[in-house]
């Protein structure tokens, strides 16, 4: 993907085509890829305020905030609808991005929506066809996404390109987002997006676990109907008894060379024992448990817990923690253990907090209530998560 002039320069000018972020495993807002190291998402004022006043101690546990951009709908030469961003002044050079380009990923999304390879994509047709999308059925069950299989699809310029495997959840969110924009706003309306660090850019096969943290998920400004809906979800899931539930995951299976994906509907149904088994599955590559990942993950979670305990007045309602590691098989050496683990290089893992649209703290512009002390629900969830991972570690 590069910054390029459209042939319809008078109407469009320079812009950065945004592609669905193919490693989005949870959430309901569409996350889009701006370049190899940057993603963007619809701007929510409370989340922007959080990033702009972020405590220093939390910066290593959150994506780097890179500012905001304006985004608009745009049709390509074939009439297909996409999103394009005004480029940042410091990023006017061509971008280096992954092979899963917008021409492939967005084409796949819109073909699922319209069911036609040659017809344009009218706004009304796009909105109607969302209800008929097979993607929703696919997302209700387990799915394996091959990174070897490479069916040919047609790119924007008519050439044949390979489509690599991807998580369907990001396409589902992108499709829903396009439909909302189409139905609620004129095509030429400008939308503001947050620019954030792509926290998985350094991983070859990013394994990602999205954990919704805390015993409460609704914000202070939620309507009574929304409060009741979120309270019911918490009561019927591990959010109530553990303070944490699975919101999505993808884990690379080395034996099948594919990602095993789970979505939020799977996570809501899990019992405490099911949650424990899902954590084990997240650390299993299809042939063995990646036991060497447990200690670095636990150290990182323990460090996060220490930071959260020190943040008075913060309530991270509906926020998530991402646990990330590389599913690329580690290189073995002559000094490797019997399990085939490299004896030298440490396992590359990360833990990041994301999604702060409903986070409140003293000084936030629309605070309804000022809380005292750290977030008890978030701490409860982290403590239980650490305890379960310790049990898995000791069991191995």
UniProtKB/Swiss-Prot annotation:
* GO MF terms held by the record: ATP binding; inositol hexakisphosphate 5-kinase activity; inositol hexakisphosphate 6-kinase activity
Q: What does this protein do?
A: Converts inositol hexakisphosphate (InsP6) to diphosphoinositol pentakisphosphate (InsP7/PP-InsP5). Converts 1,3,4,5,6-pentakisphosphate (InsP5) to PP-InsP4.
- UniProt-listed PANTHER family: INOSITOL HEXAKISPHOSPHATE KINASE 3 (PTHR12400:SF40), INOSITOL POLYPHOSPHATE KINASE (PTHR12400)
Which GO terms of the cellular component aspect does the record hold? Answer: cytoplasm; nucleus
**Tissue expression per record:** Highly expressed in cerebellum, brain cortex, kidney, thymus and lung. Detected at lower levels in hippocampus, testis, heart and olfactory bulb.
Q: Which family does it belong to?
A: Belongs to the inositol phosphokinase (IPK) family.
Please tell me whether the keyword Cytoplasm is annotated for this protein: yes
Organism, per UniProt? Mus musculus
Gene name, Swiss-Prot/TrEMBL: Ip6k3
- Provide a GO biological process annotation: locomotion
Cross-referenced SUPFAM superfamilies:
SAICAR synthase-like (SSF56104)
Q: Where in the cell is it found?
A: Cytoplasm
User: What InterPro entries does the entry give?
Assistant: IPK, IPK_sf
Protein name (Swiss-Prot/TrEMBL): Inositol hexakisphosphate kinase 3
EC number, as in UniProt: 2.7.4.21
Alphabetized UniProt keyword annotations: ATP-binding, Cytoplasm, Kinase, Nucleotide-binding, Transferase
Question: Which reaction(s) does its UniProt entry say it catalyses?
Answer: 1D-myo-inositol hexakisphosphate + ATP = 5-diphospho-1D-myo-inositol 1,2,3,4,6-pentakisphosphate + ADP; 1-diphospho-1D-myo-inositol 2,3,4,5,6-pentakisphosphate + ATP + H(+) = 1,5-bis(diphospho)-1D-myo-inositol 2,3,4,6-tetrakisphosphate + ADP
Q: Where does substrate bind?
A: 206-214
